[in-house]
Amino acid sequence: MNGDISHPRGSGPGNLGSLEETLQQMNTLIKENRDLKEALKQTNLSMKERFEGLSAWKEKQKEERDFLEQRLEEARTRLNTMDVENEALKNQVKELEKSGAECLHTELEALRGQILRIQAEKNDLVAMNSELQLKMGQGSPSNSFIEIRIADDDLKVTKDLSSVPEASAFSMPKAESEEQTVRQLLRSLRAETDEKERLQLTLQEARGRIAELESKLEHADSSAQTSLPSAAETNASTEVKNLEDQLLKLCNELKQAQIKLDEAESMKRNLQDRCKDLEQDLGTLKTQLGDKQKVQAENDCLKVQMESLQAAIKLEQKKTQDEKNNLNQLKDAYTKLFEDYSELQEEKKKRESCVSKDDYDELQTRFATAEKALADKQQKIDEMKMELFQKEKDLETISVFQAQAEIYSSDFYAERAAREKIHEEKERLATQLEYVKKQNSQLQEEMESLGRHSMSEMQRRHVPRGANPQGPTAPNNLPGGRGEWQQQNIPDHACPKCGEVLPDLDSLQIHIMDCII
């Protein structure tokens, strides 16, 4: 009897070994599940960090594109203003050329008339002087010849001056014709000064001759008084009167010549002032022409810069579009992985109480596929990083960006503010992540407490049935055939140690864990 009763207990170590293996498998499954959860968590965090990095890089590229567009707009406005200023300067130059040519033409005609008038007066003075010299018998033909020759030279000079502007006005450009007219005016000023000096010399000579004539008259008077008779005295007196009249006339002519000299000096001063004004106008025109050339060169440079900026902006837009497409693909992959992760979490929550080998294999295959997908995405991300690195190198090699390196240094403070903003956003996301972690840990604790509560409820539900564990073995005095029949009719959900019959497999597993402990 005792041997038959102890026989079912003797078969306990084999069942105990299978139970330990089951517990070990369950522990390994739980551990692998935790590892899988941790790996998914880490991949989620890494994907989130990479997504944040890509978002920050996208914001930076957007700021740079906005800055380049702003610079392009400024360059366009500056080009428009420069074009307007260029047109205004062209109109001013045309007006100045037109007014300057008209003024120079009128002044040239006036100077020609004055030179001809002065020349005629000089010829009259020379003729009068020669006539006086012939009358007095003291004339110097060499001097008169020199004066006439000088007058002829003046005529030639005036003719040259009148012919040169006409030839230059038609042959030379406007700027060169203005310079030529200034030079001609300077030559005319020099001729006027020479003429003034000659007139002063002629005045001095005339005064000297008048003094000689007066001395000769006095000598003639004295000689006439001593040697000649009364008739000769009368002739001498008449001759003296004639000479005095001639002297008075000559003095008047000298006064008129002095007045003309004063007029010539005033005209000379006016011409000098006009020459100074023309030189100043010429200098201003030259400076305006230089400024115009500089503005034109700056316009050309700005056009070249604008074309290069437009090409760079087009290239940057194309790159940003490609990066946007890649980012959208990454977002789709991330959402898909997140959905897979959420499905795995839900399935884990559903099957956490009873994990079978098939489920474990399925989880393992899904985990392998998830790891493979993550590896593929990581490879794609690395390739994108390499492409981004290459694109950054290409961007650095652009000459326009190198030329604007100094401008970028002025944007340091704006970039620092953007970085501070990004740092604040990261801190905010970190706080949100901590909050999510806390919620996750709370949910896990609630799940564990719920599992323990359900396990305790199941234990409490099944303990009253096993309150009399010796019930099936109570009839110890039964014959051996009856014991063997009972051993053969043991139900499937009976405890191998104590023989307690349980309604289902879950209750049996919980009871076995409690009974073994």
From Swiss-Prot:
- MF-aspect GO terms: K63-linked polyubiquitin modification-dependent protein binding; zinc ion binding
Note the coiled coil stretches, chain numbering: 15-127, 174-453
One GO CC annotation, please?
Golgi apparatus
Q: Where is the composition biased (Polar residues)?
A: 222-237
Gene3D superfamilies (alphabetical): L1 transposable element, trimerization domain (1.20.5.390), Nemo cc2-lz domain - 1d5 darpin complex (1.20.5.990)
One GO biological process this protein is involved in is: vesicle localization
Question: Where in or outside the cell is it found?
Answer: Cytoplasm; Cytoplasm, Perinuclear region; Golgi apparatus; Golgi apparatus, trans-Golgi network
Q: Where is this region: Disordered?
A: 216-237, 454-488
Q: Which Pfam families match?
A: CC2-LZ, NEMO, zf_C2H2_10
Keyword Metal-binding in annotation:
yes
Keyword Thylakoid annotated = no
Q: Where does Zn(2+) bind?
A: C495, C498, H511, C515
Give all cystine bridges in this chain. none
Zinc finger residue extent: CCHC NOA-type: 487-517
Please provide the record's keywords in A-Z order: Coiled coil, Cytoplasm, Cytoplasmic vesicle, Endosome, Golgi apparatus, Metal-binding, Zinc, Zinc-finger
Question: In UniProt terms, what function does this protein have?
Answer: Probably part of the TNF-alpha signaling pathway that can shift the equilibrium toward induction of cell death. May act by regulating membrane trafficking and cellular morphogenesis.
The name this protein goes by in its record: Optineurin
